[in-house]
Regions:
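Short glycine-/small-residue-rich Rossmann-like dinucleotide-binding loops
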Residues: 69, 75-76, 95-96, 221, ...
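Generic hydrophobic/aromatic pocket-lining and core-packing "Φ" positions
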Residues: 23, 47, 104, 142, ...
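Adenosine-phosphate binding glycine-rich loop
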Residues: 118-159, 269, 274-370
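An N-terminal-biased, well-structured beta-alpha scaffold segment characteristic
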Residues: 2-106, 110
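Glycine-rich phosphate/diphosphate-binding loop of Rossmann-like nucleotide-binding domains
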Residues: 6-45, 152-240
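Rossmann-like adenosine-cofactor binding region
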Residues: 209-291
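Glycine/serine-rich phosphate-binding loop and adjoining beta1-alpha1 elements at the start
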Residues: 2, 8, 77-170, 298-300
């Protein structure tokens, strides 16, 4: 198989889909790997490392997309990449289709086999390719939030950890999943007072055990969320429904009651955000203010630490890349129910129910199309 690795073009996206180590393994297995020049440069993986591993360095994204049987990326294609789509192409990347109907339409129109990292499941039912970036984004969210709490950046001027004689800041984490637990770890490490809000009482019990009672846990309902965000200096949005648009847990009315200069970091923005006032932003223009509250809603937060993020991501994705290359997409999908869960588009048909529900489109199970 010919595997293509283009340079990411989303704003300040610095990660890369395959590392030199991955290239070496693919080439040794008899595959050909085309890497766009400078694709790994911002992840501290220069062209010469890819060449030494056996990759062919290609001068343009056009040729990578045109020649590859399977394109391996990090982020969902942006509009300027839609023209590269063609029938039968296998696209393996984060897709986050629910809030982007235009991308869904293009993938369907061109009959691309779109396999989304974020909806692949393992035998335990977890999301193994979403987990590493959720870990990174969860940890980063508190670092970023702490920075934006500084007065110079429009925040309240609060130090999350406090100092002797001055109480710490309050951090409210919406969602007790991978993002939430990692955000809580960092916030606690900084000395903040941390509250985690989740709908699942069993998950709240688990979190209480994990943190030995050192975090506050709240059952998610309108009353509790309103109170928690009103008291918070920093709110982290980390709600996930795999493949679907994130529910709006924090409403505009709740935001209007928050402290002036408080900060919201909505990590769920990839799936539309769980804060009603959230809208996607970029690393070039990351923050804005609504009702005196600073909002940071960058859709590719882990790109700010590309070396760590690329290694963490590809550790998880590469076994699937190798399986798809070895078996071909159809056979690999047929043999692995977890990989089937990752197929969002196939032969012009939408195959992910949460995306279909979010966009009001018809869908079919991919197993019925094979």
């Amino acid at each position: 198989m010919i595997i293509g690795v283009p340079k990411e073009v989303k704003d300040h996206e610095s990660r890369v889909g395959v590392t030199p180590a991955g290239v070496k393994a693919l080439v040794e297995a008899g595959h050909k790997v085309l890497v766009e020049t400078k694709a790994g440069e911002l992840s501290a993986m220069p062209d010469d490392e890819y060449q030494s591993a056996g990759a062919e360095i290609v001068g343009s994204a056009y040729d990578v997309w045109r020649l590859a049987d399977m394109v391996v990326k990090v982020k969902e294609p942006v509009e300027k990449e839609y023209g590269h789509f063609r029938e039968g192409l296998v696209l393996f990347t984060y897709l986050h289709l629910a809030p982007v109907p235009e991308l869904t339409a293009k993938l369907l129109d061109k009959k691309v086999v779109g396999i989304a990292y974020e909806t692949i499941r393992d035998k335990a039912g977890t999301l193994p390719l979403l987990t590493p970036m959720s870990e990174v984004a969860g940890r980063m969210s508190v670092q970023v939030g702490a920075a934006y709490l500084e007065k110079e950046k429009g925040g309240r001027g609060v130090l999350l950890g406090g100092v002797p004689g001055v109480p710490p800041g309050n951090v409210c984490v919406i969602g007790g999943g991978i993002v939430g637990i990692n955000a809580a770890k960092v916030a606690m490490g900084m000395g903040a007072k941390v509250t985690i809000v989740d709908l699942n009482l069993n998950r709240l019990r688990e979190l209480d055990d994990i943190f030995n009672g050192r975090v506050y846990t709240l059952a998610s309902n309108s009353y509790n969320v309103t109170h928690a965000v009103r008291e918070a200096d920093l709110v982290i949005g980390g709600v996930l429904i795999p493949g679907a648009a994130a529910p709006k847990i924090v409403t505009k009315a709740m935001v209007s009651k928050m402290k002036k200069g408080a900060v919201i970091v909505d990590v769920a923005i990839d799936q539309g955000g769980c804060i009603e006032t959230a809208r996607p932003t970029t690393h070039s223009d990351p923050a804005y203010v609504v009702d005196g509250v600073v909002h940071y809603c960058v859709t590719n937060m882990p790109a700010a630490v590309p070396n760590t993020s690329t290694l963490a991501l590809t550790n998880a994705t590469f076994p699937y890349v190798m399986r798809l290359a070895k078996m071909g997409a159809k056979a690999a999908i047929e043999s692995d129910s977890g990989l089937r869960d990752g197929v969002n588009t196939y032969d012009g048909v939408l195959t992910c129910k949460p995306v279909a529900d979010s966009q009001g489109r018809p869908w079919k199970a991919v197993g019925d199309l094979l």
